[in-house]
């Protein structure tokens, strides 16, 4: 799993088509519409990925994504092996800070966490998936979190 910040940007001026049939030209000026975080989970051998968008990237956001992964995507699995970078929010402690102790313990006991080494982000397949997603889906300005979520859902459907 991995996540990335995303800057929501709008157009200051409508893109112009200089000549009929030409690509529309974007103005270098834009309107900043806030930021959000994109979370990606991937299971390479099953050719599966899940993408979600959240307003923030807090311990609570990470814990809620993990709960979704364990209860909605893999409810029947006893143990999930999670490979991710060593970010301060990526700990089982985040589960205990976000949920009642009994629920947090149940979730934490189903996780087997492996951290990628420092300067070894290329080992994190979810990061590779994020790069592909950025090139294939986020190659333009998107100004609204709902629109971003819809675009990423469509990308996820095509990729899965």
Predicted regions located by residue number:
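Extended, low-complexity cationic-aromatic segments
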Residues: 1-67
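Short catalytic/ligand-binding loop motif for oxyanion handling, primarily in non-cytosolic enzymes
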Residues: 7-9, 89-92, 122-125
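RNase H-like polynucleotidyl transferase catalytic core
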Residues: 25-30, 103-125, 141-144
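Short, basic/hydrophobic alpha-helical segments
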Residues: 60-81
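Acidic/histidine-rich, metal-coordinating catalytic segments
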Residues: 77-91
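Short, aromatic/basic amphipathic alpha-helical patches
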Residues: 94-104
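Active-site proximal helix-loop segment of RNase H-like, two-metal nucleases, encompassing DDE(D)
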Residues: 118, 126-145, 158-160
């Amino acid at each position: 799993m991995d996540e990335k910040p995303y800057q929501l940007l709008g157009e200051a001026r409508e893109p112009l088509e200089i000549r009929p049939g030409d690509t529309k030209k974007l103005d270098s000026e834009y309107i900043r519409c806030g930021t959000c975080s994109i979370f990606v989970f991937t299971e390479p051998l099953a050719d599966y990925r899940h993408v979600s968008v959240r307003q923030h990237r807090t311990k609570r956001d990470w814990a809620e994504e993990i709960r979704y992964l364990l209860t909605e995507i893999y409810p029947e699995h006893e143990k999930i092996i999670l490979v991710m970078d060593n970010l301060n929010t990526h700990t089982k402690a985040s589960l205990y800070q976000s949920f009642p102790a009994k629920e947090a313990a149940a979730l934490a006991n189903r996780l087997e966490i492996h951290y990628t080494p420092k300067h070894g982000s290329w080992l994190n397949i979810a990061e590779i998936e994020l790069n592909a997603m950025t090139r294939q889906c986020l190659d333009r300005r998107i100004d609204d979190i709902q629109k971003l979520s819809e675009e990423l859902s469509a990308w996820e459907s095509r990729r899965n």
